[in-house]
């Protein structure tokens, strides 16, 4: 029972920390507010996480783990390249839609120069959650070598796909205003967004022979 309570306390602290870092970023976050929101105190937080930096890095680690879980699953499935790319794009958009707070934290982190991400990559570079990007890169490079994709820069392609998926959510308020997107109809818009990105990426990556096959089906 004590172990269960310890895990519950730790999770409450992490949940409160997410809200704090979303609103204030790392530099503006206060441990006292996290303690109050989690129904604990600063001594308990320091007992579990040792420091504000360790707590923040634990939050970042959870973001990477959640973001890469679906990627790992897709890479482990025996699917065609087209189905793999479609699965990755659709599930990444689902992740962004369901976790807006995590995207906000990443924006704060990027604004600070990504110093904590750099530290985490050095610390956990060989762990699965931080190794998925390398696996995805190798997948694209291998398929390019086999002629299943056009000869493109794999790194640039991954960054482009991530940007296309994330841009709407990063700039959602202005996008809804500029493009007159009804918040009540957003689910349908996001559904169409998935289709548009998949279509654009597949037609940009597939060799001409594969494009012709897709048109015929």
Locate each region found by the language model.
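Helix-turn-helix
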Residues: 1, 12, 20-54, 58-59
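Generic hydrophobic, amphipathic alpha-helix propensity
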Residues: 9-18, 34, 59-63, 67, ...
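Short hydrophobic clusters on alpha-helical segments that form packing/core surfaces
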Residues: 13, 17-21, 92, 201
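Short coil/turn segments at alpha/beta junctions that flank glycine-rich nucleotide-binding fingerprints
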Residues: 23-27, 99, 146
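Short secondary-structure transition hinges
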Residues: 54, 93-135, 141, 156, ...
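Amphipathic alpha-helical linker/stalk segments
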Residues: 59-88, 139-142
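Hydrophobic alpha-helical connector segments
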Residues: 73-104, 132-133, 154-161, 191, ...
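C-terminal peripheral helix-coil segments that are non-catalytic and often amphipathic
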Residues: 91-94, 130, 134-150, 164-217
């Amino acid at each position: 029972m004590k172990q269960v309570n310890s895990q519950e306390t730790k999770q409450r602290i992490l949940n409160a920390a997410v809200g704090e870092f979303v609103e204030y970023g790392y530099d503006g976050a206060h441990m006292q507010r996290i303690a109050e929101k989690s129904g604990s105190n600063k001594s308990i937080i320091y007992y579990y996480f040792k420091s504000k930096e360790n707590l923040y890095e634990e939050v970042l680690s959870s973001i990477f783990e959640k973001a890469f879980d679906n990627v790992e699953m897709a890479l482990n499935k025996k699917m065609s390249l087209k189905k793999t790319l479609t699965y990755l794009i659709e599930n990444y958009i689902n992740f962004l839609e369901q976790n807006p707070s995590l995207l906000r934290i990443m924006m704060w982190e990027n604004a600070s120069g990504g110093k904590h991400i750099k530290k985490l990559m050095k610390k956990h570079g060989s762990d699965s959650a931080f190794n998925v990007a390398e696996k995805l890169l190798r997948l694209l490079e291998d398929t390019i070598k086999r002629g299943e994709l056009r000869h493109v820069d794999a790194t640039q392609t991954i960054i482009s796909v991530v940007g296309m998926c994330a841009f709407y959510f990063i700039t959602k308020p202005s996008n809804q205003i500029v493009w007159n997107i009804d918040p009540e109809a957003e689910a349908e818009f996001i559904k169409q967004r998935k289709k548009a990105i998949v279509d654009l990426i597949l037609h940009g990556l597939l060799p001409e022979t594969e494009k012709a096959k897709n048109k015929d089906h």
